[in-house]
C-alpha cells in the first residue's frame, strides 16, 4: 500500500475502535507510569482530536511537569506552555496554545507524538504534513509514539526524512526501542 492508502486505512480503522474511552484511560495510565515520563521535567503533548488517543485526561493528571503543546507557525510546529483556558482552533481543527512561552531547551524533555500508524520498531506514519518529522530532526529529546494497539503494525516502509520513535505506548504495552 502507498502512504496515502495506509493513511486512509488507518483513519477508517480508528473510527471502528471499540471501547475507546477505556483504552484512552489505560494508555494514560501507561504513560503516567512510564519511568522516563516520571523523571522528566518537560512534557510536549499534542492536543487530541476526537479519533486520536485522548490526551486531555493525561494532561489533567500530569503533576509537577511543564506541559507544552504544538502550534503551527508557517510550515513548522513549535511548542508553547499549555494553558487550557487560552486555546484557539487552527485551520486543521486542532486546538493550539495562544501563549508566548516557547520551549527552546529540550533537556529533561519527553514528547508524546501522534500518528495514524506505528510499527513495532518505532516507525511512524503521520498525517502527511511533515510537521513532527521537521520538529524532531536534530533535537535530543525522548520520543514516545502513542496509539491504539490496533494501529500498531509489524512494519512500515519509511523514507530518509521519517523520524523513528524511541518508544511506543498503547493500551496493552509500552515498549522501549533498542
Describe each region flagged by the PLM:
Residues 126-131:
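Charged helix-capping and loop-helix junction motifs
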Residues 1-106:
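N-terminal active-site beta-alpha-beta segment that forms phosphate/nucleotide-binding
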Residues 1-5, 12, 64, 98-101, ...:
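Surface-exposed, charge/polar-rich loops and edge strands
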Residues 46-48, 113-114, 145-147:
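Short beta-strand segments
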Amino acid at each position: 500500500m502507498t502512504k496515502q492508502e495506509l493513511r486512509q486505512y488507518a483513519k477508517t480503522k480508528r473510527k471502528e475502535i471499540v471501547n475507546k474511552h477505556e483504552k484512552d484511560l489505560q494508555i494514560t495510565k501507561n504513560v503516567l507510569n512510564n519511568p522516563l515520563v516520571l523523571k522528566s521535567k518537560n512534557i510536549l503533548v499534542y492536543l487530541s482530536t476526537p479519533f486520536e488517543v485522548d490526551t486531555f485526561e493525561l494532561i489533567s493528571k500530569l503533576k509537577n511537569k511543564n506541559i507544552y503543546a504544538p502550534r503551527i507557525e508557517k510550515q513548522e510546529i513549535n511548542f508553547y506552555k499549555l494553558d487550557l483556558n487560552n486555546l484557539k482552533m487552527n485551520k486543521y481543527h486542532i486546538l493550539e496554545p495562544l501563549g508566548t512561552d516557547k520551549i527552546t531547551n529540550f533537556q529533561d524533555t519527553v514528547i508524546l507524538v501522534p500518528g495514524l500508524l506505528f510499527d513495532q520498531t518505532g516507525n511512524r506514519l503521520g498525517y502527511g504534513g511533515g510537521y513532527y518529522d521537521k520538529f524532531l530532526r536534530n533535537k535530543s529529546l525522548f520520543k514516545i509514539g502513542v496509539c491504539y494497539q490496533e494501529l500498531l503494525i509489524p512494519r512500515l516502509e519509511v523514507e530518509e526524512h521519517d523520524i523513528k520513535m524511541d518508544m511506543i505506548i498503547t493500551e496493552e504495552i509500552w515498549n522501549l526501542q533498542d
